[in-house]
UniProtKB/Swiss-Prot annotation:
UniProt protein name: UPF0102 protein Maqu_2464
GO molecular function terms listed in the Swiss-Prot or TrEMBL record: nucleic acid binding
Superkingdom per UniProt: Bacteria
NCBIfam families referenced in this protein's UniProt entry, alphabetically: PRK12497.1-3, YraN family protein
Protein family (similarity comment): Belongs to the UPF0102 family.
Gene3D superfamilies (UniProt xref): 3.40.1350.10
Matching InterPro entries: Restrct_endonuc-II-like, tRNA_endonuc-like_dom_sf, UPF0102_YraN-like
Length: 123
């Protein structure tokens, strides 16, 4: 039951992130992509670049901010999932990057959203 609640909460914040990104000109093309490489929360187009988004939410009082919560292991999984997606769809020649969206409760607005472009690099 807790897992289902966590999944719904994750989908809610992915929706918040998608609306934010669309307001900034990103065209969301896929959500919750699962493949052998792992999971990608959102995939979008930023001009000619294919962007893989990791969405993170942290409540007030969390020990770690959302951006810092992306561990080295999670970064490796994201790179693997993005690589698998590019390979599977024949998009190796496409400019791509992995961005992180951090969401926390806002003070003057409902949410505070931080967008780090090219946050994760493949080694």
């Amino acid at each position: 039951m807790a897992r289902e609640g966590s999944r719904k909460l994750g989908q809610h914040y992915e929706g918040v992130a998608a609306r934010y990104l669309e307001s900034k000109g990103i065209r969301i093309i896929e959500r919750n992509v699962h493949n052998r490489g792992g999971e990608i929360d959102l995939i979008g187009m930023d001009a000619e670049a294919l962007v893989f988004f990791e969405v993170r939410f942290r409540a007030d009082g969390a020990l770690v901010d959302p951006i810092s919560s992306v561990s080295a292991v999670k970064q490796q999984r994201l790179v693997r999932a993005a690589s698998f997606y590019l390979h599977r769809h024949g998009l190796w020649d496409r400019v791509s990057r992995i961005d992180v969206i951090g969401i926390t409760p806002g003070h003057s607005s409902k949410y505070r959203i931080q967008w780090i472009k090219n946050a994760i690099q493949a080694d």
